[in-house]
Amino acid sequence: FFATSIQADGWIPNITIGGNNGDEDYTAYGATFLFTPNDRFEALLTVESMDDQSALKAYNQNFNVAPGVIAPPPPGPNTTDFSGGLLACTIYPQACRTSPDQLGYAENDTQHDASVKTDAITLNMSYELNDNLTVKYIFGYRDVTEDRIYDYDGSAAPFITLERWNVYDQTSHEIQLNGSYNNVEFTAGLYMFEKEFEQDWATG
């Protein structure tokens, strides 16, 4: 049996909604079972579950800069000049970034909530046919559900948010024939992989 738990407060203060960005809340647990009825056969089964409710650590910086924050680029045919500031600062001047320095705080007005849950099953079975040949079967299953929201612009202004809901199922089967004869070793087999993915994204 194994288990892991990680709990931590956020690491960067948020001056718009309070608290800190980047808190961690992760738990995982599982068990492994070994079955060896004789010297030729072995089965190893692992069942585990992971639950990650940690907030997203990305998109912590506001890049809606005011006029004069970014210097004009050198002359050239493929340059973009942001020295006049961004349009967002005209609409929401209170949400403008006024310094090019790395900020010691976050300004996003939407908390970066996230949830990722994973259930997993792995099975390995092997049987020795003789001293030279071994048959092996490997099974894997993953069930993942994900829900997260980003404050994409990272500012105090009510601009772009992106919310994602994903559901992912994966199943795999593998059969191997492993051989070893003097100086020759080989592996032959079949592999099947099946997955199903559902995605629902919304912007606001």
Listing of model-derived features with the role each one plays in the protein:
Residues 1-12, 16-75, 117-123, 169, ...:
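Transmembrane beta-barrel wall of Gram-negative outer-membrane proteins
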Residues 110-111, 122-124:
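Generic recognition of flexible, low-complexity loop/linker segments
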